[in-house]
Amino acid sequence: MDSKFEHIEENGIKYLVHPKDSIFAGMKIRENPEDAFNNAIKRGLKNPDDWMYMYSENNKDYFKNYYTRNYKSFPQFGIKENIKNRFKER
C-alpha cells in the first residue's frame, strides 16, 4: 500500500485511511482484510471466494460480489463486543 495512507486503530482494528487529497478521502480499509473475511464468515458470509473486501465504515465491513457486483455488509462486533467497546470508551 502507498505510504500516503494514514495508519489508525479503532476498537482494536488497524486501518489504512486514504489521505485528504484523495477522491477516497477518509475511506478506511483494514490493514488485514483476512480478518474482515474471517469475521464475515463467522457472521454468515457464504461462498467467500465470490466476494471482495472493499472497505469498512460505521463498525461494518463491506464486500462486493465478483459476479453480481452487489454489496453486502457485516458488523465487525457482536453484542458482547459492542458493550465492551463502549465501556472502554468511557
Indicate residue ranges for each PLM-predicted region.
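Short, low-complexity N-terminal segments with a bias toward positive charge
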Residues: 1-19
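Non-Sec secretion/translocation targeting segments of pathogen effectors
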Residues: 88-90
